């Protein structure tokens, strides 16, 4: 991938949910919930504080995270769908 987020932003590859219910019913795209879990694939350098020092991000590439349903902006790079958001939009890391 050739995308580098700036400042305190991160790029997340959403983890897709099943397209069928346990009973075998196929869920159409229009009825699917937006995924709220994903894996971080790129991170910015951090945010600059009032003293001009860069504070690095806590999240790192490979972390699996939980984020808000409407967080971030969806983009597509080389056919790969990503969500770009600020680190503060992430609720936490999934272990």
From Swiss-Prot:
It is found in: Cytoplasm. This is Co-chaperonin GroES. It comes from Rickettsia felis (strain ATCC VR-1525 / URRWXCal2) (Rickettsia azadi). PANTHER family: 10 KDA HEAT SHOCK PROTEIN (PTHR10772), 20 KDA CHAPERONIN, CHLOROPLASTIC (PTHR10772:SF63). The keyword Chaperone applies. Heptamer of 7 subunits arranged in a ring. Interacts with the chaperonin GroEL. GO terms for biological process: chaperone cofactor-dependent protein refolding. GO terms for cellular component: cytoplasm. InterPro entries: Chaperonin_GroES, Chaperonin_GroES_sf, Chaprnonin_Cpn10_CS, GroES-like_sf. Belongs to the GroES chaperonin family. It comes from the Bacteria. Keywords: Chaperone, Cytoplasm. Signal peptide: none annotated. Together with the chaperonin GroEL, plays an essential role in assisting protein folding. The GroEL-GroES system forms a nano-cage that allows encapsulation of the non-native substrate proteins and provides a physical environment optimized to promote and accelerate protein folding. GroES binds to the apical surface of the GroEL ring, thereby capping the opening of the GroEL channel. GO terms for molecular function: ATP binding; metal ion binding; protein folding chaperone; protein-folding chaperone binding; unfolded protein binding.
């Amino acid at each position: 991938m050739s995308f580098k987020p700036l400042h305190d932003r991160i790029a997340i590859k959403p983890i897709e949910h099943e397209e069928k219910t346990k009973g075998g019913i196929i869920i159409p795209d229009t009825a699917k919930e937006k995924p709220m879990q994903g894996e971080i694939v790129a991170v910015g350098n951090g945010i600059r504080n009032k003293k001009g020092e860069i504070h690095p991000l806590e999240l790192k590439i490979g972390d699996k995270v939980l984020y808000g349903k409407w967080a971030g902006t969806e983009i597509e790079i080389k056919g790969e769908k990503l969500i770009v958001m600020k680190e503060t939009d992430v609720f936490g890391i999934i272990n």
